[in-house]
Curated annotation (Swiss-Prot):
This is Probable feruloyl esterase C. Involved in degradation of plant cell walls. Hydrolyzes the feruloyl-arabinose ester bond in arabinoxylans, and the feruloyl-galactose ester bond in pectin. Active against paranitrophenyl-acetate, methyl ferulate and wheat arabinoxylan. Belongs to the faeC family. The lineage of its organism: Eukaryota, Fungi, Dikarya, Ascomycota, Pezizomycotina. Its EC number is 3.1.1.73. InterPro entries: AB_hydrolase_fold, FaeB/C/D, PLipase/COase/thioEstase. It is found in: Secreted. It comes from Aspergillus flavus (strain ATCC 200026 / FGSC A1120 / IAM 13836 / NRRL 3357 / JCM 12722 / SRRC 167). GO terms for molecular function: feruloyl esterase activity. It comes from the Eukaryota.
Amino acid sequence: MIKSIILQAIMVLSTLTSVHGANSSGCGKQPTLVNGVHKINDREYILKVPDNYNANKPHHLIFGLHWRGGNMNSVVNGESVEPWYGLETRAQGSAILVAPNGRNAGWANTNGEDVALIDAIIKQVEDDLCIDQSSRFATGFSWGGGMSYALACARAKEFRAVSVLSGGVISGCEGGHDPIAYLGIHGISDPVLPFDGGVTLANKFAANNGCQQAYVGKPGLGSHSSVQTDFKGCSRPVSFIAYDGGHDAAPLGVGNPLAPDATWKFFMAA
């Protein structure tokens, strides 16, 4: 079983185009994939195609990864966060969004099975829909942040950027040596995945990207504010936002634009 998963992942990965690639094979086709739940083997994901979808226009591809105890519907419906982490509204029809379902309400990524799932979804979606293959992104909170970090490690050549909200090394880090645009957002009083660990994740990709070392600033306790640190001299951008809060799916409160605005701006500038 394990060998089968690994072999399937290698075969799918060999068909994926890097962030330096062109448009997907789905461009110009009449699509067959529709909004809603889709299956790959024994796994599921929810797909959201813009209402104004144009098969001749390449779209961004954005993965929204749920937290521990959540599921794909939590991301789509906006449980404790804006729907789709606030990115659907900011994309204004320019992105196709995917919310995969983790196994056992999480992303243990055992033997790389969750990375393999993402690979398979990319292939299925891009074979049918028009995607700019240089414009794939992933974001998630908590375990979803950990899974986004795992994708940064294992699929830096396939994704342009990730935004890790209150993440940790909880889905592994296969590879982890290639540069990728990396945004970390973390509460200074996080009791679940400590703030310093979030800084360590960002520092890893700052090193991969050849950035100058930087002091990561923090807001005052009780200030209800945030401090953004942009690393300098990087081959690919690295930023870290420290906010006054704990382990929060929506930093500074549901409806606060901090994380959605920062993530969208970072993705588009990456």
